[in-house]
């Protein structure tokens, strides 16, 4: 058998092996997550938040200076799966998944939301991953903002713990429209961590943010998957 005949056979075998590995790992992850008592895990929210802030997001603590971080989440602008794939959502930014290139209304960069007291801080980043804009929404603006749940469909429906929401933040000009999830992910392309414990941690932190936001502002309250 010639080498030219062996090459496609080897490729097929390797591809099949990789596909089986990914499928098996995803199945194991789903089983662990589905069997997790998230109400009990929620008691670990503070520990999980401190761990992520220290290991993955120290720049948020630097930006907040002396202000306390009560809760945090990731955010993105509305972005279709096809567009995101075209822009290659593959890289990592400070240990987290990125979203592409420019700001709110065109191509995307990662955004971070931090709840501190009654204020909500929005951090936007440049193409180098550095924070280049810091907006603060006070109580008055948040009382006139909106948060609505995104209907689940297709693959996202299977990831019910990572429910998406549209967040419309009031400004002096037009509202800033963002998408946030009940999990530390930037977009609806599957970015959920492959490690089951990291997945549990990401879900708890995302839900903690939504719970604290809803507790402060009833107009920004949505149903939380881990309490349903």
Task: Name the predicted role of every residue range.
Residues 56, 60, 64, 117-120, ...:
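Hydrophobic, Leu/Ile/Phe/Ala-enriched alpha-helical segments that form helix-helix packing faces
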Residues 14-27:
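Cytosolic-side junction of a single-pass transmembrane alpha-helix
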Residues 3-17, 170-228:
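Terminal and domain-flanking low-complexity segments
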Residues 96-164, 175, 184:
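Phosphoinositide-binding peripheral membrane targeting modules
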Residues 166-168:
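Beta-strand secondary-structure signal
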């Amino acid at each position: 058998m010639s080498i030219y005949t062996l090459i496609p056979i080897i490729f097929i075998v390797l591809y099949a092996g990789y596909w089986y590995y990914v499928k098996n790992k995803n199945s194991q992850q789903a089983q662990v997550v589905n069997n997790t008592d998230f109400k009990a895990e929620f008691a670990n929210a503070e520990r999980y938040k401190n761990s992520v802030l220290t290991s993955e997001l120290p720049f948020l603590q630097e930006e907040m200076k002396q202000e306390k971080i009560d809760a945090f989440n990731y955010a993105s602008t509305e972005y279709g799966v096809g567009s995101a794939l075209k822009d290659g959502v593959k890289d990592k930014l400070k240990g987290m998944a990125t979203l592409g290139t420019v700001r709110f209304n065109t191509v995307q960069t990662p955004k971070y939301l931090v709840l501190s007291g009654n204020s909500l801080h929005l951090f936007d980043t440049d193409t180098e991953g550095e924070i280049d804009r810091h907006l603060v929404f006070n109580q008055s603006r948040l009382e006139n903002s909106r948060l609505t749940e995104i209907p689940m469909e297709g693959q996202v429906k299977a990831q019910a713990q990572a429910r998406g929401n549209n967040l419309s933040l009031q400004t002096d000009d037009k509202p800033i429209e963002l998408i946030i999830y009940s999990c530390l992910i930037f977009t609806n392309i599957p970015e959920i961590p492959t490690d089951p414990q990291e997945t549990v941690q990401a879900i708890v932190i995302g839900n903690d943010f939504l719970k604290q936001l809803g507790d402060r502002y009833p107009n920004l309250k949505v149903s939380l998957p881990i309490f349903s």
